[in-house]
Curated annotation (Swiss-Prot):
This is Ubiquinone biosynthesis protein COQ4, mitochondrial. This protein may be expected to contain an N-terminal transit peptide but none has been predicted. HAMAP family: Coq4. Keywords: Lyase, Membrane, Metal-binding, Mitochondrion, Mitochondrion inner membrane, Ubiquinone biosynthesis, Zinc. The gene is COQ4. Belongs to the COQ4 family. Pathway: Cofactor biosynthesis; ubiquinone biosynthesis. Its cofactor is Zn(2+). GO terms for cellular component: extrinsic component of mitochondrial inner membrane; mitochondrion. Lyase that catalyzes the C1-decarboxylation of 4-hydroxy-3-methoxy-5-(all-trans-polyprenyl)benzoic acid into 2-methoxy-6-(all-trans-polyprenyl)phenol during ubiquinone biosynthesis. It is an enzyme of class 4 (lyase). It catalyses: a 4-hydroxy-3-methoxy-5-(all-trans-polyprenyl)benzoate + H(+) = a 2-methoxy-6-(all-trans-polyprenyl)phenol + CO2. The keyword Amino-acid biosynthesis does not apply. It is a peripheral membrane protein.
Length: 300
């Protein structure tokens, strides 16, 4: 006879993108000869508030935060874990972020329309001129081999309204990269996390900003070159989550930066020390010289 022991916690492999699923969605049963999982009836009886919603108890939410945080804040390239961490800590900041959106006419219109950026969206943007927000967003995605729908869906937030707020932040993150000409590499992802914390007070951005640099080979150089710029830009610029990006696809990206009160990092020597950033800026300069860039009132 084998003895099966129900466990609310399960063994997991932190290298797997799905390692948290047994932790929050199943009761695991161990025996001498086998390990199996079956749905937990207690979870299946909970109300689902939107498609894909996975309701969690407070204890499960805490475990999700710890499990995703241990790995996610050390490796910000693990988008699945960062997504889980941001949702499990959402109760701390999402209501405030939602209130920020309600404070501006543009933000209120976003919450009313609830637009989503999908793969179909970018097909329409490929015909725009270089230098427009929409076209540069397409170029940025293509350069990194990314697409809008590669972002993880929102699952663990109970309120449909706050779930959309999280989705909006998640879907527009790559537009922040585009706005500041930041490539999808670890140093620049961390720079953007610092900026997001300064701009929106996101806890997950703070955690990534504190622990993520431990993995950098040039920590001191990164700190000197990027942290002051990110903190200043996030603090002085408009709240990025309140921007209705879809209505600005055809706007010159330099003009948009001026409107939002933000600038790219033009500190002395930064381009020389960061090749990925330099490459994006050089492509832009070459297109400007050829007259193939939307004319903008911005130094380049």
């Amino acid at each position: 006879m084998t003895l099966a022991i129900p466990l609310e916690l399960s063994l997991f492999d932190p290298t797997s993108a799905d390692f948290l699923v047994p932790l929050i969605s199943f009761s695991a049963y161990f025996s001498v000869k086998s390990f199996t999982m079956r749905p937990c009836p207690r979870l299946l009886t909970r109300k689902l508030n939107y498609p894909g919603h996975i309701p969690l108890s407070p204890a499960q939410n805490a475990l999700l935060a710890v499990g995703s945080g241990v790995v996610g804040v050390l490796d910000v390239t693990r988008g699945d874990l960062i997504a889980s961490l941001s949702e499990s800590t959402a109760g701390i900041f999402l209501p405030a972020l939602h209130e920020k959106m309600k404070m501006t006419p543009e933000g209120r219109q976003i919450m009313k329309d609830r637009p989503e950026i999908t793969n179909k969206t970018i097909e329409k943007l490929k015909e725009l001129k270089r230098g427009t927000l929409g076209r540069e967003y397409v170029e940025w995605l293509g350069g990194g081999g990314l697409e809008p729908e590669s972002r993880a869906p929102v699952q663990y937030i109970d309120s449909p309204l706050l779930a959309y707020t999280m989705l909006r932040y998640r879907q527009t993150h790559d537009l922040y990269h585009t706005l500041f000409s930041l490539p999808p590499t670890l140093p620049h992802e961390l720079s953007l996390k610092v900026l997001e914390f300064s701009n929106m007070s996101l806890p997950v951005a703070l955690l990534s900003s504190v622990f993520g640099p431990l993995r950098l080979k040039r920590k001191e150089t990164w700190t000197r070159d990027w942290v002051p710029w990110a903190l200043r830009t996030g603090r002085e610029g408009r709240s990025l989550v309140t921007v209705y990006w879809e209505k600005r696809w055809e706007q010159g990206i330099g003009e948009l930066r001026r409107e939002l009160g933000v600038e790219r990092n033009d500190a002395e020597g930064v381009e020389a020390r960061w090749g990925g950033y330099r490459k994006i800026r050089e492509v832009e300069r070459e297109l400007r010289r050829k007259g193939e860039w939307v004319d903008e009132p911005e130094d380049w």
